């Protein structure tokens, strides 16, 4: 069984948990207390010198960055390739959505909310505009689509639903974006492990109360 270093409230960690559920892989979950500096201990730095979560250790093979872990789990353990198809064009669209999630959507969350939550900084209206722009892009991608990349559930949906659910508990108004809202309601029903994702979201919500 693969060791999985994580925090339940972390959106990237939750995307891996849902992906593991989708491919039927059990994870040996190991809570890492970042506030206590457990990620900076020599034994963890040996595993991941970048000292980030999530981190997966599968039979001695260590990997971090959630979207890389998602793809690895599907390629190694998926019974089919439906979550990450081998077709170059289909895969390219999924990759684009994953990079969009990492570099634009989730990044906009981190840039706006983290300074307020962890450094008690005032809200930055310019950073909030970046969130709105990211949701406008996602809304456009989802025009006429039930899924984020193609016509069935993929790792792109799983990564995005982890991010979008985090925006929801932070109080962002997702319902303003009709296509995102429709996709999100469907994703809640069809994404394996959604319940555990939502439990993690509620744990994260305490930072916004």
Swiss-Prot record:
This is Glutathione S-transferase 1-1. Homodimer. Signal peptide: none annotated. Disulfide bonds: none annotated. Keywords: Transferase. PROSITE patterns: GST_CTER (PS50405), GST_NTER (PS50404). Residues 1-81 form the GST N-terminal domain. Conjugation of reduced glutathione to a wide number of exogenous and endogenous hydrophobic electrophiles. Coiled coil: none annotated. Gene3D superfamilies: 1.20.1050.10, Glutaredoxin (3.40.30.10). GO terms for molecular function: DDT-dehydrochlorinase activity; glutathione peroxidase activity; glutathione transferase activity. It catalyses: RX + glutathione = an S-substituted glutathione + a halide anion + H(+). The gene is GstD1. One of its GO terms (biological process) is glutathione metabolic process. The keyword Transferase applies. Glutathione binds at residues 51-53, 65-67. The keyword Transferase applies. Residues 87-209 form the GST C-terminal domain. Belongs to the GST superfamily. Theta family. It comes from Drosophila yakuba (Fruit fly). Its EC number is 2.5.1.18. It comes from the Eukaryota.
């Amino acid at each position: 069984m693969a060791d999985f270093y994580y925090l339940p409230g972390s959106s990237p960690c939750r995307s891996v948990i849902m992906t593991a559920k989708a491919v039927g892989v059990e994870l040996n979950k190991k809570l890492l207390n970042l506030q206590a500096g457990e990620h900076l201990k020599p034994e963890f730095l040996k595993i991941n010198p970048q000292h980030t979560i999530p981190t997966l250790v599968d039979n001695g093979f260590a990997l971090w960055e959630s979207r890389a872990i998602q793809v690895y789990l599907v390629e190694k353990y998926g019974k089919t390739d439906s979550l990450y198809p081998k077709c170059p064009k289909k895969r390219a669209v999924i990759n684009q959505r994953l990079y969009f999630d990492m570099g634009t959507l989730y990044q906009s969350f981190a840039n706006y909310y983290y300074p307020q939550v962890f450094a008690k900084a005032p809200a930055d209206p310019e950073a909030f505009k970046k969130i709105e722009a990211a949701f406008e892009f996602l809304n456009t991608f989802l025009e006429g689509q039930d899924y984020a990349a193609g016509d069935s559930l993929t790792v792109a949906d799983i990564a995005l639903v982890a991010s979008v659910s985090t925006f929801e508990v932070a109080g962002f108004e997702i319902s303003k974006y009709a296509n995102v809202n429709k996709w999100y309601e469907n994703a809640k029903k069809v994404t394996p492990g959604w319940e555990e994702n939502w439990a993690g979201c509620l744990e994260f919500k305490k930072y916004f109360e």
